[in-house]
């Protein structure tokens, strides 16, 4: 649903912020 999709998007952005060099 929309809510879990929004959470997943924020979580993805969070992972990008904490591990930018890993990707």
UniProtKB/Swiss-Prot annotation:
Record's subcellular location: Postsynaptic cell membrane; Cell membrane
Lineage, uppermost ranks: Eukaryota, Metazoa, Chordata, Craniata, Vertebrata
Quaternary structure (record): Pentamer of two alpha chains, and one each of the beta, delta, and gamma chains.
Function noted in UniProt: After binding acetylcholine, the AChR responds by an extensive change in conformation that affects all subunits and leads to opening of an ion-conducting channel across the plasma membrane.
Catalytic reaction(s) noted: K(+)(in) = K(+)(out); Na(+)(in) = Na(+)(out)
Entry's family note: Belongs to the ligand-gated ion channel (TC 1.A.9) family. Acetylcholine receptor (TC 1.A.9.1) subfamily. Gamma/CHRNG sub-subfamily.
Protein name: Acetylcholine receptor subunit gamma
Membrane topology summary: Multi-pass membrane protein
Origin species: Electrophorus electricus (Electric eel)
GO cellular component: postsynaptic membrane
An annotated Gene Ontology molecular function: transmitter-gated monoatomic ion channel activity involved in regulation of postsynaptic membrane potential
Main localization of the protein described in the UniProt heading: membrane
Keyword annotations from UniProtKB, A to Z: Cell membrane, Ion channel, Ion transport, Ligand-gated ion channel, Membrane, Postsynaptic cell membrane, Receptor, Synapse, Transmembrane, Transport
